[in-house]
């Protein structure tokens, strides 16, 4: 479902207020996910005239949602360009990825982030947190930033927004890399299953 071939990238001149550059960030709204820093970063780019729309998707913890709403109310009180959806059925989520131009992941603490793998498989160029294990997974197929620094997030977004060729190359790289992880996970799960069968057989 999430394996979407990388699409043909548009030049920055093709984006406008009626057809904005769409960023998607799927993750739980939580303190270590830094959605408010992402909103701040996008606002700074919009203030410079770049037509960007931000879509945040995921359930929320109350304190973090309150913090997000405070920032959103300051920069986009009418929610013209920042959209938040608390729940989207998993079977429909791939449609949101398919409509996006850029995937973003700003977590500062993860184990094995499936959401990052989904974003990679969705054929999107990715701006990503520099905190581990994200660089180990995405390798050289993304543009990295410190998730606690809105200025760095903005620079990473702009680097991708401004370069059609960079977006094209990185989206192809990350999409291919996602296939490797899919096969590795399949092999690992098969190995675990066979071990369980073996253990049960010899009991």
Language-model segments: what does each one mean?
Residues 108:
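Aromatic "clamp/platform" in nucleotide-sugar-dependent glycosyltransferases that forms part
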């Amino acid at each position: 479902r999430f394996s979407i071939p990388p699409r043909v990238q548009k030049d920055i001149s093709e984006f406008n207020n009626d057809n904005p550059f769409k960023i998607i960030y799927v993750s739980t709204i939580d303190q270590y996910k830094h959605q408010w820093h992402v909103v701040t970063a996008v606002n700074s780019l919009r203030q410079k005239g770049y037509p960007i729309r931000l879509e945040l998707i995921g359930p929320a913890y109350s304190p973090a949602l309150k913090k997000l709403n405070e920032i959103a109310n300051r920069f986009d009180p009418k929610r013209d360009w920042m959209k938040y959806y608390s729940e989207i059925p998993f079977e429909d989520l791939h449609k949101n990825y398919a409509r996006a131009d850029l995937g973003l992941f700003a977590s500062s603490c993860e184990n094995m982030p499936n959401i990052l793998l989904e974003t990679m498989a969705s054929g999107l160029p990715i701006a990503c947190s520099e905190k581990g294990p994200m660089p180990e997974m995405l390798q050289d197929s993304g543009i990295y930033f410190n998730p606690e620094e809105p200025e760095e997030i903005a620079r990473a977004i702009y680097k991708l927004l401004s370069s059609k060729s960079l977006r094209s190359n990185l989206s192809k790289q990350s999409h291919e890399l996602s296939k490797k992880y899919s096969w590795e996970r399949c092999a690992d799960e098969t190995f675990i299953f066979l071990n369980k069968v073996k253990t049960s057989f010899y009991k």
